[in-house]
């Protein structure tokens, strides 16, 4: 289930602004095993086709033109490649196949036996390093990648602020002359500290930082160092600051261990502990969340399609779940962790839903579609979307914020 979005949720609960929370990542992956395809495309030069060996991206070149200028890059973006793939799947020309056998057979012509044997080992090791299940799937399905292709398809949507996504906290950048005033203004009153959120003294790095994608692991490590140095500077500049919390240690203990206390109090009310009128176990909460997000918030079951009415219904169900979530119960420390993870997932999901509802366009075709606003609308929506949960009013507030180009964009307007 990847990470539960704790960074996003805790920032939101603190009243920090979030940015671009409508952005999600839906990569193509090896079907059922979730193995990565990037190495095959880039290192092994493999090609993907529909069931009839047609290059689906080239085939839908005219269709992709309606997303210009973004479709005019030398390498078509991931979401638009997904868009072409989804057309093939919906029109019955699946499955989509990654032709590992073509790539390896071509490589074999250029290599001696020793080099080729090493390449095959690399192909397997790529999955054994990152996704053991994919190697297991190949084995159990009798697939030898040098002889047979493998199915690929788009994944379920997920969040990340560091890889190919940009959802996360709205953070301050460096206090340098080249940074536009628009990107400094929100922090003028509380201080210009690199990677500080709009809550004074709350810093982020890596996945949690929004509008800062394509950092990957190494970039996230660097960003962690940037944030750490800025935190030290903040501490030195605020030596007299003495943070205090309202609650006592005992009150916090009761809150944190609340799900365990609830289970102990009510576990004997029924014969089977999973079915109990007094609580929900973490698995139940997660199943409800996944079902409603998939069906109403542009999940796989609707081919990533949604609209205003679906989103509003999803929000209604999500807020019912948020209310029921207060009755989470945990049998042990593992389920206690799961109970809190689910709380964070629900908060993150709510922010995501509200952002998709707020942005009245389809900014990322292939990742999600607004059926009622099916096009990219740069005239009105080439901007940041910001949200903030107000701890005083207990309400979400959403706004747009100007996007200022710093580095010249060859695809920009």
What are these regions (language model features)?
Residues 3-13, 46-49, 76-77, 230-233, ...:
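Short, surface-exposed, polar/charged, turn-prone segments marking secondary-structure boundaries
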Residues 22-213, 295-413:
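Mobile, glycine/GP-rich and aromatic-enriched active-site lid/loop segments adjacent to catalytic centers
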Residues 16-23, 234-246, 367-368:
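Acidic/polar loop patches that form or flank catalytic/metal-binding clefts of enzymes
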Residues 236-331:
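Long, amphipathic alpha-helical stalk/connector segments used for oligomerization, subunit docking
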Residues 191-193, 197-260:
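Catalytic phosphate/nucleotide-handling subdomain of diverse soluble enzymes
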Residues 14-15, 52-53, 228-239, 360:
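A generic secondary-structure signal for well-formed alpha-helical elements
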Residues 1-36, 217-230:
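Glycine-rich loop(s) and the adjacent beta-strand/alpha-helix scaffold that form part
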């Amino acid at each position: 289930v990847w990470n539960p979005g704790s960074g996003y949720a805790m920032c939101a609960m603190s009243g920090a602004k979030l940015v671009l929370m409508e952005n999600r990542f839906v990569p193509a992956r090896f079907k059922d095993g979730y193995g990565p395809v990037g190495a095959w495309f880039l290192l092994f030069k493999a090609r993907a086709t529909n069931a009839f060996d047609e290059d689906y991206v080239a085939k839908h070149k005219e269709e992709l033109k309606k997303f210009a200028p973004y479709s005019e890059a030398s390498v078509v973006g991931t979401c638009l490649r997904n868009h072409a793939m989804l057309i093939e799947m919906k029109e019955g020309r699946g499955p989509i196949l990654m032709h590992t056998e073509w790539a390896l057979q071509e490589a074999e012509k250029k290599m001696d036996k020793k080099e080729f044997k090493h390449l095959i080992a690399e192909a397997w090791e790529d999955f054994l390093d990152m996704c053991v299940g994919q190697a297991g799937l190949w084995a159990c399905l009798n697939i030898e990648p040098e002889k047979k292709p493998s199915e690929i398809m788009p994944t379920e949507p997920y969040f990340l602020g560091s890889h190919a996504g940009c959802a996360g906290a709205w953070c301050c950048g460096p206090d340098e002359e080249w940074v536009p005033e628009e990107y400094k203004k929100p922090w003028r009153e509380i201080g210009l500290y690199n990677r500080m959120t709009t809550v004074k003294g709350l810093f982020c790095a890596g996945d949690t930082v929004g509008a800062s994608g394509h950092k990957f692991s190494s970039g996230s490590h660097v960003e962690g160092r940037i944030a750490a140095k800025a935190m030290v500077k903040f501490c030195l500049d605020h030596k007299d600051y003495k943070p205090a919390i309202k609650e006592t240690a005992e009150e916090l203990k009761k809150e944190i261990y609340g799900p365990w206390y609830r289970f102990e109090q009510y576990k004997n009310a029924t014969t089977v502990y999973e079915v109990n009128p007094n609580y929900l176990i973490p698995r139940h909460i997660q199943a409800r969340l996944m079902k409603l997000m998939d069906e109403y918030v542009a999940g796989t079951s609707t081919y990533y399609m949604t609209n205003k009415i679906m989103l509003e219904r999803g929000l209604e169900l999500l807020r019912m779940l948020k209310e029921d979530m207060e009755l989470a119960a945990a049998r042990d420390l593992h389920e206690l962790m799961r109970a809190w993870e689910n709380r964070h997932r629900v908060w993150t999901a709510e922010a995501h839903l509200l952002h998709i509802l707020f942005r009245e366009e389809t900014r990322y075709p292939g990742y999600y579609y607004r059926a009622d606003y099916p096009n990219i609308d740069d005239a009105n929506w080439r901007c940041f979307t910001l949200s903030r949960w107000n701890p005083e009013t207990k309400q979400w507030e959403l706004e747009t914020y100007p996007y200022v180009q710093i580095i010249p964009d060859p695809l920009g307007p």
